[in-house]
UniProtKB/Swiss-Prot annotation:
It catalyses: AMP + diphosphate = 5-phospho-alpha-D-ribose 1-diphosphate + adenine. PROSITE patterns: PUR_PYR_PR_TRANSFER. Its main location: cytoplasm. It comes from Cronobacter sakazakii (strain ATCC BAA-894) (Enterobacter sakazakii). This is Adenine phosphoribosyltransferase. Belongs to the purine/pyrimidine phosphoribosyltransferase family. Homodimer. The gene is apt.
Amino acid sequence: MTATAQQLEYLKNSIKSIQDYPKPGILFRDVTSLLEDPKAYALSIELLVERYKNAGITKVVGTEARGFLFGAPVALALGVGFVPVRKPRKLPRETIAESYELEYGTDQLEIHVDAIKPGDKVLVVDDLLATGGTIEATVKLIRRLGGEVTDAAFIINLFDIGGEERLNKQGITCYSLVPFPGH
């Protein structure tokens, strides 16, 4: 099933835009409104699964927290394991960490050291692509553990912020269902 223009428009219309959130001048794309619509939520998962069902994926990695909401059902439908990447001190077993830059400072992500095996073919899934910093850090974690990442999939791509170009430079192909301007 290839995504039709009508299906993609349905998904786009299910995402509410909130002006001046979280601060003045920002137009926030609220993917939680898509989750409230079971038809839209199911369709978003179906379209991602369709794209990757024959790609040889062995693990799906989702980033905290909304990446879990899309990554886990994609992994389940593909019949592969799901691996969460989380903020520091949220995972109980031994982890490795990767820092990344925020607008005002840095943050860190962690992954269990035994979650990815050398040679795993990994799909990274998140709700939204903006600057690409979170996904870049996630890819570094996966690669440090020997996993191969070639694709990252998103529901929303804020296409004019530059995240896709940033990830393409790291050898990551980006796929998104719904493009929006970032400003």
